[in-house]
């Protein structure tokens, strides 16, 4: 079968059971699938096996070592431990701050080629899934490795929707928080609280082997996927002083999320189907991204045997960090500061002179155009056709054009990433900036859960306990406090001044009689 025929055949199958209720305009917005999007039919990596041996000569001792190389081009770090200079040497360690070139797991969930700008879920190009799939189906794909049949998809959607209600106790916790509580803080707290309401699924309470049961695992998966948007919506409504809205069982995943945000309790309300489809595509794009910071945190926590709710809460906490999940908010602030396209040349010069920071460009993995950003950029016009055009989009397009034609940025491989345009779309859809990261976290639950599930089946899974390279004092002996002398004048080596409130000063100024 020719490549184009294979693509058409794949699309025909997808279209038969993935069609959304209304995709008006999207067929013109999303790009046509390119002929190279046929990776779903390729079962082996193009480079073949990389298996062999690595010969290492230790110039310190003159010894020669043979280290096995796997078919995937990896060496076991523990094999380097045998490289030693003598009895007091504990063996060679890998020093890799930030895990720039360390693979703590083997995974079949997500593939990224940052140099070529490729992202695939279970072998499917992200462009193809964004074009034809739905978030709930992509969640199934990530979790179980294959696209579901029509009946499997129906069962999956129904089961997830049946677990969308949140325990009243969790809603009470959300309602007890301040009106100005950050939605991500609310999401972390509520996700962690779910552990308390499901003690039957906690290995610390119900036995370490509980997750060996497929039924138990699957139940936690649908619980979290179902409840995440309900919790997020409750956090959103809390900031407006409004009570939570019960989910609807008659809407799609993304429609239901918008329904809980906007219905004001009107059970007959239905979100705009085109906006719901845009949100669904954004959810697909954010669902998974292999071993990013928060996913690594989820797997790290899960390796201890902790319950999956705590693992996901910890992952969301990592996503809360501004270096991970908060970049799209920084992009909006940057574009607003630039103001108009006429100010871009001065801004570009400021970036080159290290006087200004450019947000939304560059990525830890991608040294090419982020494939997600390409899809999001095309979605912007669809959103603007419904809610009106955001003037900052003109600044964004002009900034991208200026940067990609400037040797300074091209040489450093600084291309737009997923955050560059997503913030503009979210703002156009009426979401406040503090809610952007929540819109990242809700779909990323699918990624966290698929990695959690995979780690449970991996025979190489161990409790994560990294080594360190100790650089401190080798040994010293205890001295009584009166005999100690100040060993350093450095402020970083002593306790600093912690300011106290005026109310505390007033209280301390008083006295109490016995």
Swiss-Prot record:
**Subcellular location(s) per record:** Peroxisome
Q: Name one GO cellular component term.
A: plasmodesma
Catalytic activity, per the record?
oxaloacetate + acetyl-CoA + H2O = citrate + CoA + H(+)
Broad class of enzyme this protein falls into: transferase
Enumerate the transmembrane spans.
none
Q: Name one GO biological process term.
A: fatty acid beta-oxidation
Instruction: List the catalytic residues.
Output: 324, 363, 419
Q: What is its EC number?
A: 2.3.3.16
Q: Which SUPFAM superfamilies match?
A: Citrate synthase
> What is this protein for, i.e. what is its function?
Peroxisomal citrate synthase required for the fatty acid respiration in seedlings, citrate being exported from peroxisomes into mitochondria during respiration of triacylglycerol (TAG). Indeed, complete respiration requires the transfer of carbon in the form of citrate from the peroxisome to the mitochondria.
Q: Which PANTHER family match?
A: CITRATE SYNTHASE, CITRATE SYNTHASE 1, PEROXISOMAL-RELATED
The extra comment attached to this record reads:
Citrate synthase is found in nearly all cells capable of oxidative metabolism.
Regarding protein family, the annotation reads:
Belongs to the citrate synthase family.
Stated name of the protein: Citrate synthase 2, peroxisomal
Q: What is the lineage of its organism?
A: Eukaryota, Viridiplantae, Streptophyta, Embryophyta, Tracheophyta
């Amino acid at each position: 079968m020719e490549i184009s025929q294979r693509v058409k055949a794949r699309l025909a199958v997808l279209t038969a059971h993935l069609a959304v209720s209304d995709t008006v305009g999207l067929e013109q917005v999303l790009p046509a699938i390119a002929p190279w999007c046929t990776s779903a039919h390729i079962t082996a990596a193009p480079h073949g096996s990389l298996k062999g041996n690595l010969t290492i000569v230790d110039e310190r001792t003159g010894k020669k070592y043979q280290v096995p190389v796997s078919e995937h081009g990896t060496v076991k770090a523990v094999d380097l431990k045998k490289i030693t200079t003598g009895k007091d040497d504990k063996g060679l360690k890998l020093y890799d701050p930030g895990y720039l070139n360390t693979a703590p797991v083997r995974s079949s969930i997500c593939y990224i080629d940052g140099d070529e700008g490729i992202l695939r879920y279970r072998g499917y190009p992200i462009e193809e899934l964004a074009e034809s799939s739905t978030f709930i189906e992509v969640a199934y794909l990530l979790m179980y490795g294959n696209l579901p049949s029509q009946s499997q998809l129906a069962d999956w959607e129904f089961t997830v929707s049946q677990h969308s209600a949140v325990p009243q106790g969790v809603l009470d916790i959300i309602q007890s928080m301040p009106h100005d509580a950050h939605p991500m803080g609310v999401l972390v707290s509520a996700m962690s609280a779910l552990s308390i309401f499901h003690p039957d699924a906690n290995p610390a309470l119900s036995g370490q082997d509980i997750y060996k049961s497929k039924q138990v695992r699957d139940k936690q998966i649908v619980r979290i996927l179902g409840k995440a948007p309900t919790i997020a919506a409750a956090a959103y409504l809390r900031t407006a002083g409004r009570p939570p809205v019960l989910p609807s069982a008659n809407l799609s995943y993304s429609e239901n999320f918008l329904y809980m945000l906007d219905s004001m309790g009107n059970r007959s309300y239905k979100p705009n189907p085109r906006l719901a489809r845009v949100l669904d595509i954004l959810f697909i794009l954010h669902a998974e991204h292999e071993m990013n910071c928060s996913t690594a945190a989820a797997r790290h926590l899960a390796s201890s045997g902790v319950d999956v709710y705590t693992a996901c809460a910890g992952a969301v906490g990592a996503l809360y960090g501004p270096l991970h999940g908060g970049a799209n908010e920084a992009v909006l602030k940057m574009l607003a500061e630039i103001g108009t396209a006429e100010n871009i040349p001065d801004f570009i010069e400021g970036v080159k002179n290290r006087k200004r920071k450019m947000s939304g460009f560059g990525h830890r993995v991608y040294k090419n155009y982020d494939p997600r950003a390409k899809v999001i950029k095309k979605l912007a016009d669809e959103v603007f056709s419904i809610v009106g055009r955001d003037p900052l989009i003109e600044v964004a397009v002009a900034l991208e054009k200026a940067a990609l034609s400037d040797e300074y940025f091209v040489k450093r491989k600084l291309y737009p990433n997923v955050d560059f345009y997503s913030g503009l779309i979210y703002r156009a859809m009426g979401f406040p900036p503090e809610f952007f990261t929540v819109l990242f976290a809700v779909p990323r639950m699918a990624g966290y859960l698929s990695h959690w599930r995979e780690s449970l089946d991996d025979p190489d899974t161990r409790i994560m306990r990294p080594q360190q390279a100790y650089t401190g004092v080798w040994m010293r002996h205890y001295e009584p406090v009166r005999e100690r002398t100040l060993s350093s004048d450095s402020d970083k080596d002593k306790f600093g001044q912690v300011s106290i409130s005026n109310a505390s000063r007033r209280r301390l100024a008083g006295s109490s009689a016995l």
